Design a protein with these regions (language model features):
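Unchanged
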Residues: 1-190
Length: 190
């Protein structure tokens, strides 16, 4: 996430910019290893009016009596940080990866999440068989996730072909890869 891009920006600025452009103004950036330059960049870059409820705050890994170790991955980072997130009212929690380049309309994803009555939504991107072992791959049935496998071996991929639409199938993109973008209903987290 601290990787410089285009001179003065960092990779983490992409998901933060996506949030700000979607009207999402309350964000936590969870950091752990070798994060001093990233923490400094966030602190020096994102300033909001004193009258605004908007913020971009760093939640660095911390050792507590309940969690004496470092984060053991993204899910654990979120789990250990929930006590900092809980006081902020919201019906939904958007969880993003800080190291991807994309532009996304989160409002559209949230609308789909609500329309399906989902508890959790995962943004996916169709990928080709040669790319699939680099991602978490999921199967779905009418918009509902039925199975998930993290970085599958090529030998099992034939069982993970999904309906990705005619255009993607024609391009050889038969697998749904997780983009590391999730919406959770708040009541699942607390």
């Amino acid at each position: 996430p601290a990787v410089p891009i285009a001179g003065k920006y960092r990779l983490v600025d992409i998901p933060i910019s996506n949030c700000l452009n979607n009207g999402i103004g309350r964000m936590f950036v969870l950091t752990q290893f070798n994060s001093a330059s990233l923490n400094r960049h966030i602190k020096n870059t994102y300033h909001f009016s004193a009258f605004s409820k908007a913020f971009v705050d760093i939640l660095a890994a911390e050792q507590t009596p309940d969690s004496p170790g470092w984060f053991q991955g993204t899910a654990d980072a979120v789990r250990q940080s929930l006590r900092h997130i809980e006081p902020f009212e919201s019906d939904y929690i958007l969880i993003l990866s800080g190291d991807q380049l994309y532009q996304m309309d989160f409002a559209n994803m949230l609308d789909n999440h609500k329309a399906l009555g989902a508890d959790i939504s995962v943004a996916t991107i169709p990928v080709a068989q040669r790319e699939a072992p680099e991602f978490g791959i999921l199967k779905s049935d009418e918009g509902l996730i039925t199975s998930f496998i993290e970085k599958p071996k090529k030998e099992v991929l034939q069982d993970w072909v999904s309906d990705t639409g005619e255009e993607m199938k024609a391009a050889g993109r038969d697998y749904l890869a997780s983009m590391g973008i999730y919406i959770f209903n708040r009541n699942l987290m607390f």
